[in-house]
From Swiss-Prot:
The gene is argG. SUPFAM superfamilies: Adenine nucleotide alpha hydrolases-like, Argininosuccinate synthetase, C-terminal domain. It is found in: Cytoplasm. GO terms for biological process: argininosuccinate metabolic process; L-arginine biosynthetic process; urea cycle. It comes from Paenarthrobacter aurescens (strain TC1). This is Argininosuccinate synthase.
């Protein structure tokens, strides 16, 4: 029986060429797998037909938009996950769902190997292969760009020689990855980290310098998940899409950062994540009134570690699973409404309410009706500062000897 290889297929030049390239290099039949995570553009049927036209013996396509929003974006939101304080894990959280469908397709079509289009310098090769090793430990992995010397120039020449049904061009200097959670742009002139990004970089966001009138929005949450916008019920996918539209129109969610890649290099990235950043901002403000102080402090540490694990391709790891359990427990009271104004690149919260809020007006007010017993403060301060006072006395005593 001829060996079969499952290929993560985007519909673009590199993976279209990879179908024939892999076949010629290995003698195997190629099954193309395309997963819709809200990246937009062409329909899955168009992509499926292109894969078959480029030589795939089968084409597996999956509309995973709701799955991605529910099972991958929402855990990211609950964790308030921002890698190195900036990046909302746009690409990192899409790789596990693609891996899941790659392994599923491999089982369905009897493939023994999974192929992806990643280079040897990026994070995604790790995310794909660690995920595949975890979900399908018997499966082998290959990367045509990395392992079979498939360069961009060779891809264009191969496509033209074979007459493949795909546009061949070098005109776009950027590497772009996008889904409903956001958009990532790198390479080209951006590799000089002194160069400012030009307007053509952006697609999800309008120029924040010339915004339309301020847009006030009320986002309702239930156990950490957005369930309504301005009183209209929404699914997680619909919430992200609506805020992509409204926050994007105000230029919210533009991120220009140099980050530490898993492979040991620093890389300049431009991200657009209007919906993600608006939701994370709103969610964090709701947590501020519904999560107890010590729990909130520790959750911030957990969220940072969670983001690092996911960035580093450890979505399916035991530690990440344990952190998920902690984060999920913190969300039981994160229900209520957040009012925010979207304008000029900013998402500013100006109101919050919750039936499970820990904010007590009578304790917090400085006006008549204050129920806070200030007489307790003196004793509390004495006890709170006791250890520092004792240590200071020791320091003075030793210094005087």
């Amino acid at each position: 029986m001829t060996e079969r290889i499952v290929l993560a297929y985007s519909g673009g030049l590199d993976t279209s060429v990879a179908i024939g390239w892999i076949g010629e290099a290995t003698g195997a039949e190629v099954i193309a797998v395309a997963v819709d995570v809200g990246q937009g553009g062409e329909s899955l049927e168009t992509i499926r037909q292109r894969a078959l036209g480029c030589g795939a013996v089968e084409a597996y396509v999956a509309d995973a938009r709701d799955e991605f929003a529910n099972e991958y974006a929402m855990p990211t939101l609950k964790a308030n996950a921002l890698y190195q304080g900036h990046y909302p894990l746009v690409s990192a959280i899409s790789r596990p769902v693609i891996v899941k469908h790659l392994v599923k397709a491999a089982r369905e079509f009897g493939a023994t190997t999974v192929a992806h289009g990643c280079t040897g310098k990026g994070n995604d090769q790790v995310r794909f292969e660690v995920g595949i090793q975890t979900l399908g430990p018997d499966l082998k992995c290959i990367a045509p760009v990395r392992d079979l010397a498939l360069t961009r120039d060779k891809a264009i020449a191969f496509a033209e020689e074979k007459g493949l049904p795909i546009e061949t061009t070098k005109k776009n200097p950027y590497s772009i990855d996008q889904n409903v959670w956001g958009r990532a742009v790198e390479t080209g002139y951006l590799e000089d980290i002194w160069n400012a990004p030009t307007k053509d970089i952006y697609d999800y966001t309008a120029t924040p310098e010339f915004p339309p009138a301020p847009d006030e929005v009320i986002i309702s949450f239930q156990a950490g998940v957005p369930v309504a916008i301005d009183g209209v019920k929404v699914t997680p996918l619909q919430a992200i899409q609506e805020l992509n539209r409204r926050a994007g129109a105000q230029g919210v969610g533009r991120i220009d950062v140099v980050e530490d890649r898993l492979v040991g290099i620093k890389s300049r990235e431009i991200y657009e994540a209007p919906g993600a950043m608006a939701l994370i901002t709103a969610h964090k403000h709701l947590e501020d009134i519904t999560i107890e102080r010590e729990q909130a402090r520790f959750k911030a540490t957990v969220g940072q570690r969670w983001a690092e694990l996911v960035y580093d391709g450890q979505w399916f790891s035991p530690l990440k699973r344990s952190l998920d359990a902690f984060i999920e427990d913190t969300q039981q009271y994160v229900s209520g409404d957040i009012r925010m104004v979207l304008h000029g690149g900013q998402a500013v919260v100006n109101g919050r309410r919750s039936e499970t809020s820990l904010y007590d007006f009578d304790l917090a007010t400085y006006d008549t009706g204050d129920t806070f017993d200030q007489s307790m403060a003196r004793g509390f301060i004495e006890l709170w500062g006791m250890s520092s006072k004792v240590a200071s006395g020791r320091d003075l005593r030793v210094a005087g000897q």
